[in-house]
Regions:
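A charge-rich, low-complexity, intrinsically flexible signal that marks solvent-exposed coils, linkers
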Residues: 2-109
């Protein structure tokens, strides 16, 4: 594994703080499906689709270059989104729900 891939994996593992099981369970909720940017025709949001891909990545051992590219996308998106934290209670916020679709629960230690 190259240094770049090791760094990507370490950053991904640091920012994705939900297990595959937790994320899969979350993605089945109405709250998960209620947030995120959807295409004109509706359907699944970008974040929800990413969450399903994250579950796959968390469960596999042999990662492809496409997997590493998605891991970098997850890290970048999550860092940007964390900077937009709203004021007040975030427990039931769309901001938190969106982050959880990307595998990061800001309420987890």
């Amino acid at each position: 594994m190259t240094t770049d891939k090791k760094d990507t994996r370490a950053e991904f593992d640091n920012i994705v703080n939900m297990t595959a099981k937790e994320l899969r369970r979350w993605l089945d909720t109405d709250e998960s499906k209620s947030v995120g940017q959807k295409s004109e025709g509706g359907g699944e949001s970008t974040g929800h689709r990413s969450g399903r891909r994250i579950v796959d990545i968390l469960e596999k051992n042999d990662l492809t270059d496409d997997d590493y590219a998605h891991m970098r996308k997850v890290v970048g998106y999550t860092h940007r989104h964390l900077e937009q934290r709203p004021s007040g209670d975030i427990v039931d916020s769309k901001w938190r729900y969106s982050l959880m679709n990307w595998g990061h629960d800001p309420l987890k230690p």
